Amino acid sequence: MKNLKKVGIDTICYNWMPVISWDRTTTDRPGRGRARVTTFDYEDIKDKAFTKYGEVSKVTLWKNLEYFLKAVVPEAEKSGIKLALHPDDPQVDSIRGISRIMTTADAFRRMADIYPSPNNGLTMC
């Protein structure tokens, strides 16, 4: 973080979507103005097998996020870096056994309450 700050980067956008990050089921659907857009349809993945990591619970993700925030936010404060957590995309309960926790306003309030700091924020995407 210190090196990022030295070169003028003052915000780090990160996500809490292990294994399967941004997921899409279609990458070329027609959109407005003849644009091609990505989409996600839960029906297309709901019966797919779990990943090789099996089931990852919300409890585990919250424990890991709490550990991360308590370790990293103080360093961000020292470095003058702002952390911005990206919402889960798509905002579904789980994908192939991997839970999603950053899907609601209440979840972001909980995240902010774990380590209240102006350096602990969210990405508006």
Each language-model region and where it sits:
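Acidic/histidine-rich catalytic cores of soluble enzymes
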Residues: 49-125
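Active-site-proximal, glycine-rich beta->alpha crossover segments in alpha/beta enzymes
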Residues: 2-67
